């Protein structure tokens, strides 16, 4: 099995509100840094911050992109995000239907 030639990724970002998630996704779509975004939530998040355990509701955004666009995508998210340290993670897409992956590639710069 050969890896995908274009190294597509799913990028995960959490935000404190649906509006912020939509604003970030809209900008990334306009810049063609992502092909699409799925906003899920609210979800419960538990984490350590400033020496304390925190619990909050967030919105989880899953975005489809290419690995070579991650640095630009990440910088754009940081510029628009309200968190001091936003969660921006990329996971490789190891397989996918040809039609979907062709569409995904056609949507990106």
Report residues per predicted region:
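Positively charged, small/polar-rich N-terminal and surface patches that mediate targeting and assembly
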Residues: 1-109
